[in-house]
């Protein structure tokens, strides 16, 4: 379902559908049905999508499969989605403060928003759980993964991958990069995280083992000598 403001022009709608079709083609997906509505109820495009897929039962990964003493891997870099949105919506303001190349690079972060490539590699490797990091950021994902599995975790904050563009833009707007929308980054629990990281890096996907699960209840974040709890 696509709801568009009454200020939208037909070329914009055509471009939107073209982008959607091209993306689906890359991912070997199809758009089955849709509804488009022009209304003065919304001020910017509002899109709702329901995706349906299937997989072999033996390949199903759920949070309940996470066990103590597993590695926690984060792919690509956190904050990609929020960074690219801010760079596009506040481009003029940001370019008064930062070099144009930094903002232009941040605008292009939307090229990393699909997690299909790493999910395919993770399934082939054999993992316990995969979690797309969205609203609530990486801190929210840590909490959701640990609470859903009933395990504790300990994470090294300094190992969490983040781009300098995200750091600069978040500092400018006074937002926490660990709590912003991070679509494009995936959190994975696996027995041999370092081997999975090696496979991901071979495929050109940055990934880091940031911590481990444990049998306790605490969700611990370490930053050098400092310790905090989620």
Where are these regions (language model features)?
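Helix-biased detector of long, well-ordered alpha-helical tracts
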Residues: 1-230
């Amino acid at each position: 379902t696509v709801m568009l403001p009454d200020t939208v022009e037909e070329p914009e709608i055509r471009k939107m559908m073209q982008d959607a079709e091209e993306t689906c083609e890359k991912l070997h997906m199809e758009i089955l049905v849709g509804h488009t509505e022009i209304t003065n109820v919304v001020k910017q495009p509002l899109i709702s999508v329901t995706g349906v897929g299937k997989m072999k039962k033996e390949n199903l990964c759920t949070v309940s499969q996470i066990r103590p003493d597993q590695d926690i891997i984060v792919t690509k870099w956190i904050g990609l989605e929020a960074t690219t949105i801010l760079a596009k919506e506040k481009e003029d303001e940001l370019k008064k403060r930062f070099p144009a190349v930094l903002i232009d690079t941040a605008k292009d972060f939307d090229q990393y928003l699909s997690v299909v490539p790493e999910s395919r590699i993770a399934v082939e490797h054999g993992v316990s759980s995969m979690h797309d990091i969205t609203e609530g950021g990486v801190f929210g994902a840590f909490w959701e993964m640990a609470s859903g599995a009933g395990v504790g975790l300990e994470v090294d904050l300094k190992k969490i991958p983040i781009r300098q563009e995200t750091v600069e833009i978040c500092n400018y707007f006074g937002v926490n990069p660990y709590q912003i929308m991070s679509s494009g980054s995936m959190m994975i629990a696996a027995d041999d995280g370092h081997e999975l990281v090696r496979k991901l890096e071979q495929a050109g996907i940055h990934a880091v083992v940031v911590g481990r699960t444990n049998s306790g209840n605490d969700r611990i974040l370490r930053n050098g000598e400092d310790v905090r709890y989620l």
